[in-house]
From Swiss-Prot:
Gene3D superfamilies: alpha/beta hydrolase (3.40.50.1820)
Region annotated Disordered, chain positions: 1-84
Protein name: GPI inositol-deacylase
Residue positions with a glycan: 63, 862
Encoding gene per record: bst1
Stated family: Belongs to the GPI inositol-deacylase family.
Length: 1140
């Protein structure tokens, strides 16, 4: 193997510079140069620029006698030179310029030395990318937020620090703190007695969150107990007590970015739970009844990453069994880590989720450590722009018997989407949370809560609309409480199938009973619905409207009528019919009021009351009694009917392609039921938004209309419902099938989106429903679902660009600019790779799982269940729908534009810094232009000094600082190298200097795109220093993760240009860069942290190329260590150029 020397003189660079500014002259004879040119031209015409005796540069063609002599001499020298480095063939840093005969030399040099150049293709690509990027950002900011209707809470907070929770209880006492909340003027307490009287609740703040965020929830708990619960003796006897809110101050730690921090917080939570429970054993600190058991468990409420910390605590070794049985999380990313830049956070998430899945996969409850735990995940919806609400889903972790996911827009009397922070203080939301907690508390039990099944029923009642298929009806569990006696002249019995319409109430004195006969059983698809603007009375209440489900009460059944709580009997006739009735208010569903003046579902107006039962739920009843109890005439209405599913349910048989091309239009007939449901199975993706319009074909403001149309948009998993009052035009977006989400534990049929429309059936008019895809609004959905793509895909672009630069350099000796390399990649490898990735995305989405019988390892799994691959959606787009294959080239296009923009921003910064550097460097007075081509571009310290600096940095990485800090230092050093290289290239205008400047700049751009992967962990480390927590990370001290970067950057500080590789080993560089590009596209979103290690391997390969050139040996290494080898100094004959 032969290594080509870099022997071109600095005069050749001057000749090249003059060639860039003058036209080429014809070749002519001249004297032989003092030193032969050691490069053999391979293709085209090679121009040998040498100074003659007069000092003038003269171009010489290959056909001249001088060239033939040089070529022969050089070939002879190469043939007798023994191979020194068998691994790679190293070529010189400075070469004769090779160009095709028809290419102007001036253009070639201009392209070589102008990093600002931009081809038409690159310009058009950038403009198109900017248009798409602007449209996406504008759509996200303008169309994805919605209105803000949260009420402002009132509170008087006091935080008591638990000073007793010190280093005797936890090793984190100096970093974290535990507090108790007391509402000033409401909660009795003093320094000796904390006033602990109820069930303990522990609040966990989120990433960089404050413990003070709990004050709105805790204040509502104190006030609601003092104003309502404390005066309800029945609830007090049932075990309801106050809620003692504790909270942890995590010192605004950032658990979302660092897995070890997450584990530390979980460990502290378990220690805090043990300490809280111990407080209730001390009678001096509590005001509890002596006959009540001491608490053995704590309710956990976590916001954002605090919810993940709560789940993690149950997997830790210091967790006390059954010390936690209820967890409520708000905007917590359960399904997937919010960012994948840290390996620890990705691995920790996997371990936590695997533990929960394994626990709930157990057949027997005794084998499930989480059997008594209920987990409720609450998401804010599209207003949350910090954590994608799709990640709040727990369907892949917990079965429906132990938890569910719900959105705030679903919760009764809340009906509003909230952002990431307002979910902790929104007035409507906090009241629903606190009321549900008071319902599940039972201090008569050591667990302080009701049994798991009862807790789940209560949470469904408070958090779900009641219209879901999983909602339970309590009517069948109740006993008859009202005896109704029928009289012919005071009661109305409607015919079978007739609709009851009450337009006013209170026209008769005394209760007016309206009876609807229940259809006979066996009629499929029958449903009872009732809607009214009045609140439904419970038994014994003196309101205006009561709904009863009745069965005939026999005259002689041995049961006295006195056992009923209420006896509606206005007749003394012994032959009158009597009905034993159950009150239906227990199943009352609140719907937002929809009138002609309504604007939003969350308006502060009295909600509508709604009842809905399937015919099977009414099997033991014969009549539905609607009792008008108003004593005086009053405004109020009610509509009740039995309807057929064939009339009330419309299933749209249309695909996504049909929606995109023509949309969907449904006309509801005039004789429709009050409730009509339009179900569209094709609508399941969270990446598409829609426009829906409801048009009523009757005169606006019709006085006969009892209420304006009310629309509910819903999906079953997760439980997301949105209500639209006085509906006309609606922007529809949903959180259905989302990218990168793991599959659910139990596969269910995909029913898509359901639209339920309540309209006044008495208006006798048709209604048109039109649905179309909203392309502009859909662009905004890409931000939250694919925001990490914009950190991964640019690495693909940069890798392919650098790959093209190295290919050209190894072939020609010119290291082209980043802009030229990007343009070349756009014309060659990049479109092919994006096309291949598009085909891969389509195939991944359409691939199906092999049947169990075809699986060679089927014997190792449960024969009755197919194992679920929870990582199958981690690749590429993470989409289960092949329709979105076009997102790959779209993201590629946008990232090309982003890389071009960043390139020019970096060039501007370098230009400014190089000017500053030039002004500072002008004090030295001269610029040295070395005569030997392989000397450094600019002076550098001795090898021994460089090795000492690298050694110190590596020792610090292995002991005190994370390698991410060393990477940041390397980026800064590389930036300084680029500044110096660019200034020297402009001053000397030599090809070698331009080569090195382009090479150093491209490496800097590559490192710059890897920097975001490391910067988040670095922020965690810096935060720990700020809070005086100096314990080093147990991870991120792997020296091998940073050593190649340090050596490469330190080597480049000497100005050494990387040698050319002309053997087959040049393909190693190409393959490594291509692998980085492919990995960035396929795994870059889900496992971004590995990109750092891949680029680290590339840096190691580049370092090895340097070593092969310098003839690395142990002997020379020891000479450097001992200080015997010093850097080369310029010869006395060096050309010196005086600075202006």
């Amino acid at each position: 193997m032969h290594r080509r020397s870099s022997g071109s003189s600095p005069d050749a660079d001057d000749a090249e510079d003059s060639l860039a500014s003058r036209s080429s002259e014809p070749s002519h004879g001249c004297e032989l140069p003092e030193k032969p040119l050691p490069e053999i031209a391979r293709t085209g015409t090679s121009i040998d620029l040498r100074r003659d005796t007069n000092g003038k540069s003269t171009p010489r063609s290959r056909n001249s006698s001088t060239w033939r002599t040089l070529s022969s001499a050089t070939t002879t020298w190469a043939s007798h030179d023994p191979p020194r480095y068998p691994a790679v063939m190293i070529t010189p840093q400075r070469l004769a310029i090779e160009a095709s005969p028809d290419s102007p030399h001036r253009s070639r040099l201009a392209r070589l030395r102008s990093p600002w150049s931009c081809s038409i293709l690159t310009a058009l690509t950038t403009i198109l990318a900017c248009v798409f990027l602007f449209s996406i950002v504008r759509s996200f900011s303008a169309l994805q937020t919605g209105s803000d209707g949260c009420g402002v809470p009132v509170m008087s907070p006091t935080f008591l620090r638990m000073v007793g929770f010190d280093t005797e209880h936890t090793r984190f006492a100096s970093k974290y703190n535990l507090f108790l909340y007391r509402e000033e003027g409401v909660d009795p307490y003093n320094h000796e007695n904390l006033g602990l009287n109820g069930a303990p609740v522990l609040f966990l703040p989120g990433n960089a969150g404050s413990y003070r965020q709990v004050r709105s929830l805790a204040a509502e708990a104190s006030r609601h107990y003092a104003q309502v619960v404390q005066h309800d003796q029945e609830r007090l006897r049932a075990g309801t007590r106050s809620l003692d809110f504790f909270m942890i101050d995590f010192n605004e730690d950032m658990a979302a970015f660092h897995g070890q921090t997450l584990l530390d917080q979980a460990e502290y939570v378990n220690e805090a739970v043990a300490y809280i429970l111990s407080l209730y054993h001390d009678p001096r600190r509590t005001r509890r009844d002596a006959d009540l058991p001491d608490p053995s468990s704590v309710i956990l409420i976590g916001h954002s990453m605090g919810g993940i910390v709560a789940r993690t605590a149950l997997t830790m070794a210091n967790y006390q069994e059954n010390s936690v049985n209820t967890i409520i999380t708000m905007s917590a990313p359960h399904a997937k880590a919010p960012v994948s830049f840290d390996s620890d956070i990705v691995h920790t998430y996997k371990q936590i989720n695997d533990y929960w899945r394994e626990a709930y996969s157990q057949t027997w409850a005794n084998n499930n450590p989480l059997w008594h735990v209920t987990l409720i995940s609450i998401a804010g919806g599209s207003r949350d722009t910090v954590v994608p609400s799709d990640y709040a889903s727990i369907s892949s972790l917990v079965p429906e018997t132990h938890g569910f996911t719900v959105f705030t827009s679903t919760m009764p009397d809340v009906w509003i989407g909230v952002d990431h922070l307002s979910i902790t203080w929104c007035d409507q939301f906090r009241k629903a949370i606190i009321k549900s907690l008071f319902d599940v508390v039972d201090v008569r039990r050591a667990s302080q809560t009701k049994p798991r099944a009862e807790r789940m029923r209560i949470f469904k009642k408070w958090y779900l609309t009641g219209l879901e298929s999983v909602s339970e009806r309590m009517l069948t569990r109740n006993e008859p409480s009202t005896l109704v006696t029928l009289e012919d002249h005071t009661n109305t019995i409607l015919a079978q199938g007739q609709r009851l319409v009450l337009r006013e109430l209170g026209h008769r004195t005394g209760p007016n009973v309206h009876l609807l006969p229940v259809p006979p059983q066996g009629v499929s698809g029958k449903k009872f619905t009732l809607l009214t603007d009045q609140r439904l009375d419970r038994t014994g209440e003196q309101g205006s409207l009561e709904v009863l489900f009745c069965s005939v009460f026999p005259l002689h059944n041995g049961k006295a009528s006195s056992v009923f709580a209420l006896n509606m009997d206005s007749s003394d006739s012994s032959g009158s019919t009597r009905l034993a009735c159950k009150n239906a208010a227990v199943d009352e569903i609140h719907l937002p009021a929809s009138t002609r003046t309504s604007r939003n579902a969350y308006d502060r107006a009295r909600p509508f009351s709604y009842l809905q039962y399937d015919l099977e739920d009414l099997a033991e009843h014969q009549f539905v009694a609607v009792v008008d109890k108003a004593r005086v005439p009053m405004k109020g209405w009610a509509i009740a009917e039995f309807s057929d599913s064939s009339d009330a349910l419309i299933k749209a048989r249309i695909g996504l392609g049909g929606l995109l091309s023509a949309g969907l239009k449904v006309r509801l007939p005039a004789n429709r039921p009050m409730l009509t449901e339009v179900r569209i199975p094709a609508l399941y993706s969270s990446l598409l938004d829609y426009k829906l319009r409801v048009v009523r074909h009757h005169q606006a403001g019709d006085p006969r209309e009892l209420f304006a149309p009310l629309l509910r948009q819903s999906i079953a998993d997760p439980h997301e419902s949105k209500f639209f009052v006085n509906v006309d035009k609606v922007n529809v977006n949903l959180h259905g099938l989302a990218p990168y989400m793991p599959p659910p534990l139990r596969q269910t049929s995909q029913n898509g989106v359901s639209f339920q429309l309540w309209t006044d059936p008495t208006c006798d008019s048709t209604v048109d429903i039109t649905l179309t895809v909203d392309i502009v609004s859909s662009l905004g959905e890409l931000v939250m679902r694919y925001r990490t793509v914009f950190a991964a895909f640019p690495l693909l672009v940069v890798s392919l660009t650098l790959r093209k630069q190295f290919q050209v350099y190894d072939e020609t000796g010119f290291f082209i600019t980043f802009a030229e390399g990007l343009d070349s990649a756009l014309r060659s490898s990049m479109p092919a790779l994006l096309l291949a990735m598009s085909l891969l995305a389509s195939s991944l989405a359409t691939s199906t799982k092999l049947p169990t019988g075809d699986d060679p390892f089927h014997w190792a799994t449960n024969s009755t269940e197919t194992p679920i691959d929870f990582t199958k959606n981690d690749l590429l787009l993470g989409s289960q729908d092949a329709f979105f294959w076009f997102l790959v080239p779209l993201f590629g296009l946008i990232c090309v534009g982003v890389c071009v923009l960043l390139n020019y921003v970096a060039l501007i910064v370098l230009q400014i810094l190089s000017v500053v550097y030039g002004l500072w460097n002008s004090k030295s007075g001269y610029i040295r232009r070395d005569e030997k081509g392989y000397l450094p571009v600019f002076p550098a310290p001795s090898p021994r000094r460089r090795m000492i600096k690298m050694g110190v940095l590596l020792v610090l990485v292995s002991t005190a600082i994370p390698y991410q800090f060393a990477y940041l230092v390397a980026c800064i050093v590389q930036l300084a190298t680029c500044v110096r290289a660019q200034w020297h290239a402009k001053e000397t205008r030599s090809t070698a200097h331009y080569n090195f400047a382009n090479y150093a700049y491209s490496v800097f751009i590559l490192m710059l795109w890897v920097l975001p992967i490391n910067i988040l962990v670095l922020l965690v480390w810096a935060h720990n220093l700020v809070v005086h927590w100096f314990m080093p990370f147990s991870s991120h001290h792997n020296v091998l993760s940073i050593m190649p970067f340090i050596i490469l950057v330190e080597t480049m500080t000497t100005g050494s240009m990387i040698p050319r590789v002309t053997t087959r080993f040049k393909h190693v560089t190409s393959v490594l860069l291509f692998c980085i590009a492919v990995y960035s596209a396929v795994y870059g979103v889900s496992y971004a942290y590995i990109s750092h290690h891949l680029v680290n391997i590339l840096a190691g390969w580049l370092v090895s190329i340097y070593f092969f050139r310098s003839g690395f040996s142990l002997h020379r290494f020891w000479k450097i260590v001992e200080g015997d080898e010093t850097p080369s100094t310029p010869e006395s004959g060096s050309h010196m150029k005086k600075k202006p």
